[in-house]
């Protein structure tokens, strides 16, 4: 999932953006979880995802004070992959999504699974798990189609099989 943020991204909207794989934003974007200032805290995974995305101290400052992060800081700390002018935001997010969709679906799913799994496991465990998934993906029709299409100088036609 690709999130394109143009303007304020607060509360549940920010929690939704945090659940996305890739985030881009416009220069005027503001990110925050202000729930603490209202007497409660984010309940849709915002706490858990923010501390996994930003440095602990910065994440906790935002969570405990309700403070916001601007676009420049969001890019510097890796919350967003890039900052683009508002008029380019949607076309670029669709371009990213299309590039992902063009790839083999099972391989895309495996990369997402390994990247999530690796957060909670050692490098050695992650490498073993990645190798087992790579072997499984290597047995698919899509894994045969990619090299075949390359050698035939044509675009691959991935079917998710």
Where are these regions (language model features)?
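Residues that form generic nucleotide/phosphate-binding pockets
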Residues: 114, 137
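Crotonase-fold acyl-CoA enzyme core
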Residues: 1-108, 131, 139-140, 144-148, ...
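Short active-site-adjacent structural elements
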Residues: 118, 158-159
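Short, charged, surface-exposed hinge/linker loops at domain edges
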Residues: 115-121
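Short beta-strand->loop
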Residues: 122-127
């Amino acid at each position: 999932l690709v999130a394109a943020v143009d303007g304020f991204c607060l509360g549940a909207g920010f929690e939704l953006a945090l659940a996305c794989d890739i985030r881009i934003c416009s220069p005027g974007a503001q990110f925050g979880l202000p729930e603490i200032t209202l007497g409660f805290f984010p309940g849709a995974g915002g706490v858990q995802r923010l501390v996994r995305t930003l440095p602990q101290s910065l994440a906790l400052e935002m969570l405990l004070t309700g403070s916001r992060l601007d676009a420049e800081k969001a890019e510097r700390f890796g919350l967003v992959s890039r900052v683009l002018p508002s008029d380019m935001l949607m076309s670029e997010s669709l371009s990213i999504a299309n590039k992902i969709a063009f790839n083999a679906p099972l391989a895309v799913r495996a990369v997402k699974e390994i990247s999530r799994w690796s957060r909670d496991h050692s490098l050695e465990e992650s490498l073993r798990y990645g190798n087992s998934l790579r072997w499984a993906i290597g047995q698919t029709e899509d894994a045969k189609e990619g090299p075949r299409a390359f050698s035939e100088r044509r675009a691959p036609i991935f079917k998710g099989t």
